[in-house]
């Protein structure tokens, strides 16, 4: 894979925020993490102003309470294994034992046994993470960044659009090959403490506005699990870019999506540049001018 274009000139201390311009009409692109962090700090001064002034906000999916309930109900419907299959039979015995131990008191084994591996990987295995020092920057009781953005937009009467529908989002998850889902569950259960430490590293990097650990994690995913990266990132980036083309030329759009969607030669930053948009990383005022590409086309 080519070096991540979006960070080719990245310096420490810049938020994951880009200006997106079309002949003087400016919008903003913001890379999030789906975790409860300080939104104002993550956005920086220009990001806060851009969100407050936006004509329309785009999130990966609609995060309104009604949409969240719809998502949960549809996810649960898709999460049930066929009657002749069981999670117990799909996992290695050691993984099943670790999983049932971790979920004791939260989820009965007979219910757990009926769940698809992809659903367990995304919603259940975090229970296996052993207690430890709280991850610095995580704010228990706070909404994830993208949901905070949605709440703020709704409070100011700013229309919100999903980059994809709830159905599209669920299909990305539920169409994960069974083998891939099993591998994700077993990998997460193999060393939960290491997963906690890795999360702490990424959260710390995001808060410190240090791209390097984030880019490293992105590169590892792209190299080690190319099929997952294709389905989870690249195909969605392409679809989202086509959707955004209908709006960005009007200016004052605020687009927030997971940070990994910004990076690489198939990330949103590069895709928009290839379509003629001027895309510049927002730098602190004291920083030297950006050296990003300024030509269209």
What are these regions (language model features)?
Residues 230-297:
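C-terminal soluble interaction/assembly domains
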Residues 6-9, 14-232:
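Structured, acidic catalytic/metal-binding patches in enzyme active sites
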């Amino acid at each position: 894979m080519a070096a991540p274009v979006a960070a080719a000139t990245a310096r420490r201390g810049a938020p994951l925020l880009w200006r997106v311009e079309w002949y003087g009409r400016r919008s903003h692109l913001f890379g999030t993490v789906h975790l409860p962090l300080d939104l104002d700090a993550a956005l920086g001064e220009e990001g806060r102003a851009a969100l407050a002034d936006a004509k329309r906000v785009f999130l990966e999916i609609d995060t309104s309470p009604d949409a969240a309930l719809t998502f949960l109900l549809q996810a649960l419907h898709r999460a049930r294994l066929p009657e002749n299959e069981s999670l117990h039979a799909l996992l290695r015995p050691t993984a099943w034992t670790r999983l049932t131990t971790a979920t004791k008191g939260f989820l009965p084994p007979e219910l757990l046994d009926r769940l698809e591996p992809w659903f367990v990987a995304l919603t259940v295995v975090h229970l296996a993470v052993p207690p430890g020092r709280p991850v610095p920057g995580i704010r228990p009781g706070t909404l994830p960044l993208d949901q905070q953005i949605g709440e703020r937009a709704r409070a100011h009467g700013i229309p919100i659009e999903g980059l994809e529908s709830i159905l599209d989002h669920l299909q990305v998850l539920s169409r994960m090959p069974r083998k891939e889902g099993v591998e994700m569950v077993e990998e997460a259960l193999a060393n939960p403490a290491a997963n906690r430490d890795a999360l702490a590293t990424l959260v710390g990097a995001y808060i410190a506005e240090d791209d390097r650990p984030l880019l490293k994690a992105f590169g590892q995913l792209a190299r080690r699990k190319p099929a997952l990266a294709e389905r989870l990132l690249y195909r969605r980036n392409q679809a989202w870019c086509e959707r955004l083309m209908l709006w960005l030329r009007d200016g004052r759009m605020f687009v927030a999506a997971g940070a990994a969607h910004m990076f690489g030669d198939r990330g949103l930053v590069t895709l928009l540049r290839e379509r003629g948009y001027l895309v510049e990383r927002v730098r602190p005022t004291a920083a030297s001018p950006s050296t990003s590409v300024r030509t269209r086309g």
